[in-house]
Amino acid sequence: MSSVFEIVNQARRKNKLKRELLDNEKKVRDNRKRVDLLDNLLDYIKPEMTHDEILGIIKNMKADYEDRVDDHIIKSAEISKARRDISRRIRELTEEDKQTQGKK
């Protein structure tokens, strides 16, 4: 019986490490994006630019990123809906199978 607990404990630990790894990879990816953003900003900004021109570039970039965030939110909602539909279908199939098995 203790080996079952050990297996469960190790499986939970493995899953926790997997989540931590994914979280860390996300942080690396996010920070790389920030570096790229700053590189892009440095490419656009020139020494002879006025303060208003620089602000215009930043506002434009901000609007672009806000649009991307909105697109990702919409995509996440669509994926969540698809997952719910699949879960519902699996439940239906499971119930049908139980009813079929019960009749035999």
Curated annotation (Swiss-Prot):
The keyword Cytoplasm applies. It comes from Vibrio atlanticus (strain LGP32). Residues 7-34, 76-96 form a coiled coil. Keywords: Coiled coil, Cytoplasm. This is Pole-localizer protein TmaR. Belongs to the pole-localizer TmaR family. It comes from the Bacteria. PANTHER family: UPF0265 PROTEIN YEEX. Pole-localizer protein involved in the regulation of several cellular processes. It holds the Pfam family DUF496. NCBIfam families: PRK05423.1. GO terms for cellular component: cytosol. The keyword Lipid metabolism does not apply. It is found in: Cytoplasm.
